[in-house]
């Protein structure tokens, strides 16, 4: 079983994947993104560096997943990842235009045919204010010039993409605004229990309350 955690920049995908990995006894595949030599410049000048940044990410994500996902699944363990290959096209639709976007889609379509899709996507949602606060707190140098408008645009695009009823892969939606799964073990327990329930992984605890703090659903 292979499932992935998705969400906008700063929502806590990697942190949650790291925390769930030992609890669910899975292999862990984390996105390597800091090696992108165009990323810092992209956040300072999106129009100029968008195409280089997107193509680098596309090929990097393809290489990582095409090599690692099949190998890890052959180990007879579940796999958790902090990203999906398909989300790369979501960023491209925002950052690229015209001939560059058309060229990108052609390459993406050819590569996507070789990808193994996850059995479940855990979509972490958060408000723009929450995302901006978390981005500020983690203080990555290349994110210090992050524009609020860009995060707002991404947030809407992620909702449109992952909440679509036409999706083939089931999506478990977690509203993370009021959750602190880093410092509050009950919040992490709650998320773990929901993942186990959807994936039908034992031990699922049906008595664990699903309260109004975190509305979610599976599409």
Q: Could you say what each language-model-derived stretch is?
A:
Residues 16-17:
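Post-Walker A alpha-helix
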Residues 13:
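Conserved lysine of the Walker
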Residues 49, 53-116:
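Glycine-rich phosphate-binding loop used to anchor ATP phosphates in small-molecule kinases
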Residues 22-60:
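Conserved substrate/cofactor phosphate-moiety recognition/catalytic segment
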Residues 8:
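P-loop (Walker A) phosphate-binding loop of NTP-binding proteins
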Residues 136-146, 150-219:
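NTP-dependent small-molecule kinase module
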């Amino acid at each position: 079983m292979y499932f992935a955690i998705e969400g906008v920049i700063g929502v806590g995908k990697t942190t949650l994947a790291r925390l769930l990995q030992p609890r669910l006894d899975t292999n862990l595949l984390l996105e390597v993104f800091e090696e992108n030599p165009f990323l810092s410049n992209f956040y300072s000048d999106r129009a100029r560096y968008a195409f280089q940044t997107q193509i680098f990410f596309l090929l990097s994500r393809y290489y990582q997943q095409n090599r690692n996902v099949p190998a890890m699944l052959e180990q007879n363990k579940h796999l958790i990842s902090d990203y999906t290959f398909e989300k790369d096209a979501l960023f491209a639709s925002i950052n690229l235009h015209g001939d560059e976007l058309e060229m990108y889609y052609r390459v993406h379509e050819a590569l996507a045919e070789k990808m193994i899709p996850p059995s479940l996507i855990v979509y972490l949602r958060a408000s723009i204010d929450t995302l901006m606060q978390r981005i500020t707190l983690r203080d990555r140098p290349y994110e210090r010039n992050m524009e609020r408008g860009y995060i707002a645009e991404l947030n809407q695009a992620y909702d449109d993409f992952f909440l679509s009823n036409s999706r083939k892969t089931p999506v478990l939606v977690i509203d993370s605004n009021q959750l602190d799964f880093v410092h509050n073990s009950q919040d992490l327990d709650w998320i773990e229990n929901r993942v186990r329930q959807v994936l039908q992984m034992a031990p699922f605890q049906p008595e664990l309350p699903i309260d109004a703090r975190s509305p979610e659903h599976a599409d």
